[in-house]
Amino acid sequence: MKRWLAMICVLCCLALSGCAGAEQKGWTQEEWENVIMALASDDEEPVPESRRASFRSGWLPSAEKGFINLLLISSDAPDIDRNFGRADAILVCRTNLWTGETRLLSLPEDALVTLPEAPEPIALRYVNCFGGAGLTARCVNDALNLGISHFCAVNIEAFIEIVDALGGVTMELTEGEAQALDAAPGAQRLNGDQALRYVKLRRPGDGSIRVRALLTAVLRQTAEGGSMKRMVSLADLLLPCVDTNLTTDDIVDLIFALFGQSRPVSFDAMGFSAKDGVLNAELAAQSREFLYGGE
C-alpha cells in the first residue's frame, strides 16, 4: 500500500512539474517578433493556438459578497466562441447587488501591462489575443489591484444585435459623424446598423473612443430605462454572443440589482489615460477610489 502511495505521489509531482514547465516556457526572439508584427496588422489570428492560454479559476479572486466586479471587453474576434481578437474597449464594472449602484471605469487599451511569460510589456488590448478576457482581467488586477472576479467579452458585431433588441441607443453625433451616418448632428437614436457604422468611423487618433462611448451609452441607458422582464429576454439573446465566467445565478443577481429596485439606480462612469503608456501606482489609487470610494 505504501509503495502504491509513493508511486502516486511521484507521478503527481512529475505531472505538476510538467505543467509548471509548460507554464514557464518562454518565447524565442523570432517567435515574439512575429507575434508583435501580426498584432499590429489586420491578421485575425496573430497568436499561434499553441500559445493561447485557457482560463483558469485561480487567475481571479473570489467574488466579494454583495458585489460583482466585472471586466467587460468588446473584441474584434470574428467568432466569440474562440474569443482571441484584439480588444476594442475595456471597461471595469462594479455593481452593488443590494442597491444596484454601478460604477463603470474605462481603461486605456494602449496601456502597457505585463503578460506572463512574455519577454516585454504589451498593450492591454492585445492580451485578449493570448488568453481571452480571463487573462486580460488577471493582467488588469496585477496592474491596478481592482479585485475583478468576473469577465464578459462580446464581439462588436454581435453587440449590435443587442442595440437592436434595446430599440436603439442614443448617441451625441458631431457634424462629421452625422454626415457619415446620414443623420443630423446632436443627440440621435441609432439602430444596430447605424451603431456598427458609428464605431467603424475611425480616423487617425480616434483609437477606440467610439467603441467605448457606445458601450457606455448602452450600459447607462439599459440601467436607467430597462425592466426585469425585458432584461431577462435580453439575457437570453445575449448569452450565445458572449464569453463569460458569470453563472446563471450571477446574471439573475445582476438583473435584479439593476432592474428590481423601486427607484432608479446610480450609474457613474469615468475614464483615464495612461501617461507614457504606464499603469502606475497613482492610476491604481485613482481607479480604486472611483470604484470603491465611499463604501
Placement of each model-derived feature along the sequence:
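Positively charged n-region of N-terminal signal peptides that target proteins for export
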Residues: 1-4
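Hydrophobic helical h-region of N-terminal Sec-dependent signal peptides
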Residues: 6-14
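C-terminal motif of bacterial Sec signal peptides marking the signal peptidase cleavage site
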Residues: 17-18
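C-terminal solvent-exposed extensions
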Residues: 28-40, 44-60, 66-69, 80, ...
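N-terminal post-signal-peptidase region of extra-cytosolic proteins
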Residues: 51-59, 72-80, 86-91, 123-141, ...
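Flexible, polar/acidic helix-loop-strand segments at domain edges
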Residues: 61, 157-237
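Extracytoplasmic
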Residues: 65-68, 85-90, 99-107, 119, ...
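Second-shell loop/turn segments in exported
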Residues: 77-82, 121-131, 144-150, 200-206, ...
